[in-house]
Amino acid sequence: ELLELPLVERSQKILGALIGEELPKATLDEMVKNAFTFTAPLEKVEDNIYALELFHGPTLAFKDFGGRFMAQALAAVRGDGKITILTATSGDTGAAVAHAFYGLENINVVILYPKGKISPLQEKLFCTLGGNIRTVAINADFDACQALVKQAFDDVELRQTIGLNSANSINISRLLAQVCYYFEAVAQLPKEKRDNVVVSVPSGNFGNLTAGLIAKTLGLPIKRFVASTNANDTVPRYLKSGNWDPKTTVATLSNAMDVS
């Protein structure tokens, strides 16, 4: 059974099923092995409540899973062409992407982030590497950074000239990798508790939740999801009212979720 396999072997099978013949099996298996070099322990908090620890990667962020696999994937498919990764970050994406792509040949990374609105540790994690990693502090909030990224992707000539690509959650390779740790969470539960699982997901851009929904669609026995947000609650308000009405982003202690 899939849930009885170790993380890497299980993830190779999951991603192999999702990616199909787009990559040779041996190549994909090696990519997963190189990307998932750390664990995601499921720790019991109290009766029937568990926490999946996704901070054991090199930048202490859950996005290490997606970032490292995405770097492996782009390196495998780019051929002889050069790629420029342009991404906006509210903290954890920048660190994970910078470390995942650092030193990869013919891949440059440009990271936009809101000045003064991410933790000092996160800023040091991606602003001190140099090499093929470039960072730009924007005197605005995360949504303004994301708007600049979207504007760049709307420029067809720019996309073609520099081989523009994204490391945000619009890049499916990142989400596919994140699917794997939902399986890992359920696999670590006692067998008698695997049939009635409710997963609470901290949500900013809702990419992590999307990965969970993909896992459920693949057959993972998850009963339902809880999307946990902070004061930046555009999506919950939309689900209640049907009106899409983003507000000015509020700075909170959970800065990686500060997305309007």
Report each predicted region and the residues it spans.
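PLP-dependent amino-acid enzyme catalytic core
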Residues: 1-260
